[in-house]
């Protein structure tokens, strides 16, 4: 009785509804995303080039002005009181100054400032400030270590080589 109300309704031109439309291409659907990504990459590249070029310019300017300080705590003391002679070039990285002038950017220590940085360092290494201030012959600051071959001179050459760590070409020839 109510079956006429529940009948499926088909459009007159059923084929028109089922006609296929071409699928959009990947580029057309993501065109704006791709363009934004390209623009962002170009901006990043430009910023990186600018940063690296400014670093190179700053480094070149620092080298020209000799602002680069090498790690040498005795650098300013080494040339203190030395007057430059005409025609003689100063070593690279050396700066002139006085021993009483404070050195900027270096840690403050209780070490006495002298014009003998090499002997001061050796004296400090040998026994501290007391040893450094004591008058010592420069040869006493250096020690020499002698090594001896522990292998007996009477044992065979191949046994001698077995006990040693390093070999020379002559040692290997003699063992043959």
Curated annotation (Swiss-Prot):
Region listing for Disordered, in residue ranges: 82-176
Membrane topology: Single-pass membrane protein
Any one Gene Ontology BP term: microtubule-dependent intracellular transport of viral material towards nucleus
Cellular component, GO annotation: host cell; host cell endoplasmic reticulum membrane; host cytoskeleton; membrane; viral envelope; virion membrane
Keywords, alphabetical: Apoptosis, Cytoplasmic inwards viral transport, Host cytoplasm, Host cytoskeleton, Host endoplasmic reticulum, Host membrane, Host-virus interaction, Membrane, Microtubular inwards viral transport, Transmembrane, Transmembrane helix, Viral envelope protein, Virion, Virus entry into host cell
Primary subcellular site in the record, as a coarse category: virion
Compositional bias annotation for Low complexity: 123-154
InterPro entries referenced in this protein's UniProt entry, alphabetically: ASFV_p54 (IPR008385)
Coiled coil: none
Induction of the gene: Expressed in the late phase of the viral replicative cycle.
Segments for region (Interaction with host DYNLL1): 142-154
Compartments where located: Virion membrane; Host cytoplasm, Host cytoskeleton; Host endoplasmic reticulum membrane
Residue ranges of the TM segments: 32-52
Domain of life: Viruses
Quaternary structure and interacting proteins, as annotated: Interacts with the host light chain cytoplasmic dynein DYNLL1; this interaction is critical for intracellular microtubule-dependent virus transport toward viral factories.
Function: Inner envelope protein involved, through its interaction with host dynein, in the intracellular microtubule-dependent transport of viral capsid toward viral factories. Seems to induce caspase-3 activation and apoptosis. Plays a role in virion morphogenesis by recruiting and transforming the host ER membranes into the precursors of the viral envelope. Involved in virus attachment to the host cell.
Family, as annotated: Belongs to the asfivirus envelope protein p54 family.
Annotated protein name in UniProt: Inner membrane protein p54
């Amino acid at each position: 009785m109510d079956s006429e109300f529940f009948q499926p309704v088909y459009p007159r031109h059923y084929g028109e509804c089922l006609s296929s439309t071409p699928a959009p291409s990947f580029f057309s659907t993501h065109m704006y995303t791709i363009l934004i990504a390209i623009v962002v990459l170009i901006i990043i590249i430009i910023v990186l080039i600018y940063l690296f070029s400014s670093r190179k310019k700053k480094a070149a300017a620092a080298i020209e002005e000799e602002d680069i300080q090498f790690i040498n705590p005795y650098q300013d003391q080494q040339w203190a009181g030395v007057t430059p002679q005409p025609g003689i070039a100063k070593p690279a990285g050396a700066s002139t100054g006085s021993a009483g002038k404070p050195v900027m950017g270096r840690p403050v220590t209780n070490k006495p400032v002298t014009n003998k940085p090499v002997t001061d360092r050796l004296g400090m290494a040998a026994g501290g400030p007391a040893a450094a201030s004591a008058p010592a012959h420069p040869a006493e600051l250096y020690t020499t270590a002698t090594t001896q071959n522990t292998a007996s001179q009477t044992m065979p050459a191949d046994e001698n080589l077995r006990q040693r760590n390093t070999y020379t070409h002559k040692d290997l020839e003699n063992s043959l």
